[in-house]
Amino acid sequence: MRSHLVKPGSVYDGIEPGELGETTESVQDRVRQLESRNSFLEEQCSQIESEKRYLENQKIKYEREIRKLQSELDRMKTSPLIIGTVIDVIKNDRIIVRSSNGPQFLVNVSQYIDEKKLLPGAKVALNQHTLAIAEVIPSTEEPFVAAMEVIESVEVDYDQIGGLDEQIQELQEAVELPLTSPERFARIGIEPPKGVLLYGLPGTGKTLLAKAVAHRTNATFIRVVGSELVQKYIGDGSKLVREIFEMARKKAPSIIFIDELDSIAARRLNETTGADREVQRTLMQLLAEMDGFDKRKNIRIIAATNRPDVLDPAILRPGRFDRLVHVPMPGIEARGKILKIHCEKMTLAEDIDFKKLAKATEGMSGADLKAIATEAGMFAVRRDKELVEMEEFLEAVEKVSMAADTQKMMPSNLPETMFV
């Protein structure tokens, strides 16, 4: 029986009611499947788009890396430039330069270079083929020279130096006052000393005095050991001397301290080897730099040596080292002061007699007295004591005395012709 709802001739004509319900459910199920499939495809499409963007970013990154590596490769393939020095500046962008090989050339200048930087003495880079000036090399301090400048404050003051009051006064007058109160010298009408030479036996406090000057002054303090100026290749020692004094001029007021001066300023002899001639070149450069000072330059020189007898007479004349300060071995009162200074931070017993210790240390230097204080403390540590007593100091005096006697005996027992 046909349903009264189905019109004759319609699309549902001839379909039973049960069959019509099944068809609707299958269509709805198919729609749900298609919607689910569509959602899945949309998610896949979104994921693919995300991967596409990531790959495009990676492509840009790798292309940038390729360009960077290609640029580095091209730079590595570029011909090196020759280092030269400007000798003279001529009109019409023409410069006379000396190459690193020695000969001089008249060359052109790139239009992109500031002509104000092209001064005689300036370092420039030259094209390998045309020798045209490609760039001006900025002046830099030699790292070896820059390391000689004392940056950190030295914790040594004059009150920590015993028995050298006269030497401290002479050092203050010759080094500190010209830098801190130059008007005093101008008022009297004299030029302050340009250099001070400290000489004396080892361990008497020469380097300690220089450290105290570094602590008391706000000037740039440049410390040089004489042996550092002795270089392997010809001209390197003279170059170091020039650069040290150039740094002192740039950072004035400044103090140059040359320790172990005898290593480069020994007396010049007629018979010399190649190494001796190089040391003499360094000495002559040092003499020239010291003569180049004038009263307008706030630069002072302190030197120390324990062999004044071997120094060249040229370096001892007035105008170079105007003041020679002898640092003697400490006397009995000075030894007592030095021992008290070195024992300030030590935990001492009440029976310590510094006068007795000063008498027992006859002929000892300040360095020996410091060693005595250290050894006395070591004896107390060994015995697990709370205080350092007189007993430890007497044992320390005996130990340091034996070491000093052994050291004195060693060179005297060697034959004079041993190293000939």
From Swiss-Prot:
Keyword list, A-Z: ATP-binding, Chaperone, Coiled coil, Cytoplasm, Nucleotide-binding, Proteasome
Gene Ontology cellular component list: cytoplasm; proteasome-activating nucleotidase complex
A GO MF label: ATP binding
Statement: the UniProt record of this protein carries the keyword ATP-binding: yes
Record localization: Cytoplasm
InterPro entries: 26S_Proteasome_ATPase, AAA+_ATPase, AAA_lid_3, ATPase_AAA_core, ATPase_AAA_CS, NA-bd_OB-fold, Nucleotidase_PAN, P-loop_NTPase
Primary localization class, coarse: cytoplasm
Transmembrane segments: none
Coiled coil (UniProt feature): 22-79
Biological role stated in the UniProt entry: ATPase which is responsible for recognizing, binding, unfolding and translocation of substrate proteins into the archaeal 20S proteasome core particle. Is essential for opening the gate of the 20S proteasome via an interaction with its C-terminus, thereby allowing substrate entry and access to the site of proteolysis. Thus, the C-termini of the proteasomal ATPase function like a 'key in a lock' to induce gate opening and therefore regulate proteolysis.
PANTHER family: 26S PROTEASOME REGULATORY SUBUNIT (PTHR23073)
Record family assignment: Belongs to the AAA ATPase family.
Comment field on protein domains: Consists of three main regions, an N-terminal coiled-coil domain that may assist in substrate recognition, an interdomain involved in PAN hexamerization, and a C-terminal ATPase domain of the AAA type.
Record note on quaternary structure: Homohexamer. The hexameric complex has a two-ring architecture resembling a top hat that caps the 20S proteasome core at one or both ends. Upon ATP-binding, the C-terminus of PAN interacts with the alpha-rings of the proteasome core by binding to the intersubunit pockets.
Name this polypeptide is given: Proteasome-activating nucleotidase
Organism: Methanosarcina mazei (strain ATCC BAA-159 / DSM 3647 / Goe1 / Go1 / JCM 11833 / OCM 88)
